[in-house]
C-alpha cells in the first residue's frame, strides 16, 4: 500500500564549502532540512565518526635484544619506554578490502646505522618512521616521526604488529595468541578522526526561514580523508537502520508542489540576479569583488570560501563582512545551484538570460494592462 505525505524539505546535495588536503580538514553544507532535522542528522553523524570508524595502528613493538620496556639500550639516547611512546604517534593508512583483508600483520625491518651515517649527522642519527616501515606495506602519513636517536653504530631487527580496530584500546586488552616473550604491547588509538564540529543555521525556503542548514567541519589525522569519514559514517548508520525496515508494510511518498517549487526558484533567482552594487557593502569589499570580475550575487555565492582570500587586496575583514551580508539574505558562499541549472561555468550567462526573460515578462504584463 502506498501512503502519501505532505511536502517534506530535504537537501538535494551536500556542498564542500572548504577543503584543505594539507590539514585533512573539510567543511560540508547541507540544506534545507525541516526544523530539528539538522541537529538529528548532525549529532548522529558526529557520534558515528568519532566512535565507529576504523584505521590501522601499531599494537606491539619488538626490538631485537630488548626483553622489556624498562631497559636502556646501548648506543640509543632514549630508553625503551620513550621509544614506545614515540611509536604510538605512528600514522599508517590502508583501507582493507576483499583483496587486502584487515588481518593483523607483522612488519619486519632491519635498522642499520653505520659510522658513516653518524659522521654525516654530527654523531647522532635520528631514526624515523620511514626507516622502520616499508612504503609498500602501508602508506605512511607522518614519515618524519622521530622514534629514537642512535649515537653508536648498530644493527637491530624491529618488528611491528599492525592491527585494524576502532576507538582507543589499551595494551592489556589486545589479544595476541602468538606473542613472544620480548614483544611489548602498545596502547592503540585506532580512531582516525580528530575533531568533528557541526552548526545549525536558519535557511530560507520560499518566504519561510524556519528551516535548518547543517554545517559539518571534519578533521582527520590523515589515515582517512574527511570525505571517507563522512561516507563511512553514513553507511554505518544506514546499515543499522536496515533492521527496522522489517516493519515496511507501506510505501511512503512525499508531495511535491510544483507551484511552490517554481515560486521558490523565482524568489531565489531574483535575489541572485542582484548586482554587487545593489547590496550594502563597504567600498573596499565592493572594489575587491569588482576587481575580481564578480558582478552579481549569483557569481559571488558560487565561489567557495577558501578561494575568496586568493583575490587581490581581499582580507579576513572583507570576507567576514560578505559572509554576514549573505547570511542576512539566507545565502552563503559555495552554494550548489545545480538544481536551478546554474554552475560556476555558466552563471554569468544564466543570470543574463534570467534578467532578459524577466524584462520580457514585465513588458508583456505592461502591454496586457494597457489594453
Curated annotation (Swiss-Prot):
An example Gene Ontology biological process: DNA-templated transcription
Claim: Transcription is one of the keywords in the record: yes
Annotated EC: 2.7.7.6
Keywords recorded for this protein, A-Z: DNA-directed RNA polymerase, Nucleotidyltransferase, Transcription, Transferase
Disulphide-bridged cysteine pairs: none
Reactions that this protein is recorded to catalyse: RNA(n) + a ribonucleoside 5'-triphosphate = RNA(n+1) + diphosphate
GO cellular component labels: cytoplasm; DNA-directed RNA polymerase complex
A GO term, aspect molecular function: protein dimerization activity
SMART domains found in the cross-reference section: RPOLD (SM00662)
Region described as Alpha C-terminal domain (alpha-CTD): spans on this chain: 264-371
Pfam families: RNA_pol_A_bac, RNA_pol_A_CTD, RNA_pol_L
Region listing for Alpha N-terminal domain (alpha-NTD), in residue ranges: 1-248
Domain notes: The N-terminal domain is essential for RNAP assembly and basal transcription, whereas the C-terminal domain is involved in interaction with transcriptional regulators and with upstream promoter elements.
Membership in a protein family: Belongs to the RNA polymerase alpha chain family.
Description of how the protein assembles with itself and partners: Homodimer. The RNAP catalytic core consists of 2 alpha, 1 beta, 1 beta' and 1 omega subunit. When a sigma factor is associated with the core the holoenzyme is formed, which can initiate transcription.
Biological function: DNA-dependent RNA polymerase catalyzes the transcription of DNA into RNA using the four ribonucleoside triphosphates as substrates.
Name this polypeptide is given: DNA-directed RNA polymerase subunit alpha
Chain's gene name: rpoA
